């Protein structure tokens, strides 16, 4: 696996992947289906591209490392600023992102303090 596709993330890698994804989205506009099975495959491909974009943009938004989520440019866990959920929504056809505080007091298991 090339290092640029490893589990280690950085803003530069996110930007490169998002540019590649834009090219895929452009090509996907020209998909065609000859039958119902092909149409289903086209819809699945569109859904995969959408999921990939949501995941990349949300990951790019998180400016910390946490558990398996390892960012080279933000190597430390930051509970003060990033003990949050990232919420992705469709608002009037646009992908939007915001964060919500994780209500840790409601859970028996607490995040580590570093």
Where are these regions (language model features)?
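Glycine- and aromatic-enriched mobile tails/lids
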Residues: 1-114
